[in-house]
Amino acid sequence: MAYPVFDLHCDTADRIGWATLDLDLRFTAGTDGYFPGDETHPQDFDLIEGNACAISLTKIGKTPWAQCFATFVPDEIPAVHAARFQAQIMAHMSGQAMLNHDRMVNVRSASDIRPALKDGKVACIHTIENATFFAEDPALIEVLKSLGVLMSSLSWNAQGPLASGHDTHAGLTTAGIEALTQMEQAGMVLDVSHLNDECFDEVAARATRPFVASHSNSRTVCGVKRNLTDDQFRTIRDMGGIVGLNYCSEFLSNEATDETAA
């Protein structure tokens, strides 16, 4: 019997949904495809059934699978436009799950996951990476949670309106602190992957509910600042959270090369 897989993060939703975005959003993001070149063979990057991404129904096969499909909001997208970006990517991903309803289920709460796996379906869990638009409209936290967004991060790599990634040393903003509070009240899990150490420490001091790092590795094993320190691992554990492995080779080994890339 196959063991169930629970993957806390992937970029597939953005990659297969990119061509459905409004043109101004793609222009602002600076590329016609999620990765440069995707636009030259769009048939490989539009459907969840079969695609050239890391995750597809074809690749999953019959393995019991719970997949967090993150809507990644690029730092280049202004917060005022980020909610529209998120809505369009999530709509495409949700639509793909509905089109493949014999294989997938759009999860709206944690209690939906086990039944989906028991029925042999892929649990499609909607998440957000870099929810800058929470600073523009905090009420969207409750709205999106009701629509099935179960987890979100506050930043990507750069300094943002809520928090900062590892490119800077800035801490949580006032809006970020408010977002953390409202996410906990709504039952939306906070994802601390990409937060810098300063923001992590502030989250740890303020959080009252478990939080997770969806795709972060060990800084002791691979000394890049995107990874977690041993103390940060302990903090997440002690709060009742979990950490998902990141298969990006440069975060797995100090000796990573193109030949060892996962």
Residue ranges and their predicted role:
Residues 1-154, 159-169, 174, 223-262:
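N-terminal hydrophobic targeting/anchoring segments and the immediately downstream early-domain regions
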Residues 5-13, 195, 213-217:
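Histidine-centered catalytic micro-motifs
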Residues 97-98, 171-186, 203-213:
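Alpha-helix-loop-beta-strand connector modules within alpha/beta enzyme cores
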Residues 104-107, 188-195:
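Catalytic beta/alpha-barrel core
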Residues 113, 136-141, 198-209:
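Distinct, well-ordered alpha-helical segments
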Residues 168-175, 182, 191-199, 203, ...:
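Short, contiguous, pocket-lining structural segments
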Residues 191, 212-214, 244-247:
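Short, conserved beta-strand edge motifs with alternating hydrophobic and charged residues
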Residues 197, 205, 210-211, 215-237:
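Acidic, glycine-rich loop-and-beta core segments that form the ion-binding/anion-interacting portion
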